[in-house]
Amino acid sequence: MSLNAEQKAKVVLEHGSSAHDTGSTEVQVALLTLRINDLQKHFLEHKKDHHSRRGLLRMVSQRRKLLDYLKKRNISKYTDLIQSLGLRK
Protein backbone atom coordinates (compact mmCIF):
# COMPACT_ATOMS: atom_id res chain seq x y z
CA MET A 1 0.00 0.00 0.00
CA SER A 2 2.86 2.40 0.67
CA LEU A 3 5.25 3.61 -1.97
CA ASN A 4 8.69 2.06 -2.24
CA ALA A 5 11.92 4.00 -2.71
CA GLU A 6 12.06 3.37 -6.46
CA GLN A 7 8.59 4.79 -7.03
CA LYS A 8 9.39 7.86 -4.94
CA ALA A 9 12.70 8.44 -6.74
CA LYS A 10 10.94 8.21 -10.11
CA VAL A 11 8.35 10.80 -9.05
CA VAL A 12 11.04 13.11 -7.65
CA LEU A 13 13.01 12.94 -10.90
CA GLU A 14 9.89 13.51 -12.98
CA HIS A 15 8.44 16.45 -11.03
CA GLY A 16 11.38 17.90 -9.10
CA SER A 17 14.18 20.17 -10.19
CA SER A 18 16.84 17.65 -9.10
CA ALA A 19 17.12 14.12 -7.72
CA HIS A 20 17.16 15.46 -4.15
CA ASP A 21 14.29 17.94 -4.54
CA THR A 22 11.76 16.21 -2.29
CA GLY A 23 10.32 19.31 -0.66
CA SER A 24 9.02 21.24 -3.64
CA THR A 25 5.29 21.64 -3.89
CA GLU A 26 5.10 19.80 -7.20
CA VAL A 27 6.85 16.71 -5.81
CA GLN A 28 4.73 16.70 -2.66
CA VAL A 29 1.53 16.87 -4.71
CA ALA A 30 2.71 14.10 -7.05
CA LEU A 31 3.63 11.81 -4.13
CA LEU A 32 0.31 12.46 -2.42
CA THR A 33 -1.50 11.68 -5.68
CA LEU A 34 0.25 8.31 -5.91
CA ARG A 35 -0.63 7.47 -2.31
CA ILE A 36 -4.24 8.55 -2.86
CA ASN A 37 -4.53 6.39 -5.98
CA ASP A 38 -3.14 3.39 -4.09
CA LEU A 39 -5.65 3.89 -1.29
CA GLN A 40 -8.51 4.15 -3.78
CA LYS A 41 -7.58 0.70 -5.08
CA HIS A 42 -7.52 -0.55 -1.48
CA PHE A 43 -11.08 0.71 -0.91
CA LEU A 44 -12.43 -1.24 -3.87
CA GLU A 45 -11.74 -4.39 -1.87
CA HIS A 46 -12.13 -3.09 1.70
CA LYS A 47 -15.22 -0.92 1.60
CA LYS A 48 -15.69 -0.70 5.38
CA ASP A 49 -12.15 0.36 6.28
CA HIS A 50 -13.14 3.66 7.86
CA HIS A 51 -9.82 4.25 9.64
CA SER A 52 -7.93 4.30 6.36
CA ARG A 53 -10.66 6.41 4.78
CA ARG A 54 -9.96 9.11 7.36
CA GLY A 55 -6.30 9.06 6.31
CA LEU A 56 -7.34 9.28 2.67
CA LEU A 57 -9.48 12.34 3.34
CA ARG A 58 -6.58 13.92 5.21
CA MET A 59 -4.26 13.32 2.24
CA VAL A 60 -6.79 14.74 -0.21
CA SER A 61 -7.15 17.83 1.97
CA GLN A 62 -3.38 18.28 2.21
CA ARG A 63 -3.04 17.92 -1.58
CA ARG A 64 -5.78 20.52 -2.09
CA LYS A 65 -3.97 22.97 0.21
CA LEU A 66 -0.68 22.45 -1.63
CA LEU A 67 -2.39 22.92 -4.99
CA ASP A 68 -4.04 26.13 -3.79
CA TYR A 69 -0.64 27.40 -2.64
CA LEU A 70 0.95 26.54 -5.98
CA LYS A 71 -1.92 28.20 -7.86
CA LYS A 72 -1.35 31.44 -5.93
CA ARG A 73 2.43 31.37 -6.38
CA ASN A 74 2.92 30.07 -9.92
CA ILE A 75 -0.11 29.48 -12.14
CA SER A 76 1.91 28.01 -15.03
CA LYS A 77 3.46 25.29 -12.83
CA TYR A 78 0.01 24.63 -11.40
CA THR A 79 -1.58 24.04 -14.80
CA ASP A 80 1.34 21.87 -15.96
CA LEU A 81 1.12 19.75 -12.81
CA ILE A 82 -2.65 19.36 -13.07
CA GLN A 83 -2.33 18.17 -16.66
CA SER A 84 0.55 15.78 -15.98
CA LEU A 85 -1.21 14.15 -13.00
CA GLY A 86 -4.63 14.11 -14.65
CA LEU A 87 -6.36 16.03 -11.85
CA ARG A 88 -9.37 18.29 -12.06
CA LYS A 89 -9.03 22.00 -11.33
UniProtKB/Swiss-Prot annotation:
SS bonds (residue pairs): none
Keywords recorded for this protein, A-Z: Ribonucleoprotein, Ribosomal protein, RNA-binding, rRNA-binding
Gene Ontology biological process terms, A to Z: translation
Domain of life per record: Bacteria
One Pfam family matching this protein: Ribosomal_S15
GO CC, alphabetical: cytosolic small ribosomal subunit
Record's keyword annotation contains Ribonucleoprotein: yes
InterPro entries in the record: Ribosomal_uS15, Ribosomal_uS15_bac-type, uS15_NS1_RNA-bd_sf
SMART domains: Ribosomal_S15
GO terms of molecular function: rRNA binding; structural constituent of ribosome
HAMAP family per UniProt: Ribosomal_uS15_B
UniProt similarity note: Belongs to the universal ribosomal protein uS15 family.
Subunit structure: Part of the 30S ribosomal subunit. Forms a bridge to the 50S subunit in the 70S ribosome, contacting the 23S rRNA.
Function as written in the Swiss-Prot or TrEMBL entry: One of the primary rRNA binding proteins, it binds directly to 16S rRNA where it helps nucleate assembly of the platform of the 30S subunit by binding and bridging several RNA helices of the 16S rRNA. Forms an intersubunit bridge (bridge B4) with the 23S rRNA of the 50S subunit in the ribosome.
This protein's name: Small ribosomal subunit protein uS15
Source organism phylogeny: Bacteria, Pseudomonadati, Pseudomonadota, Gammaproteobacteria, Enterobacterales
Gene, per the UniProt record: rpsO
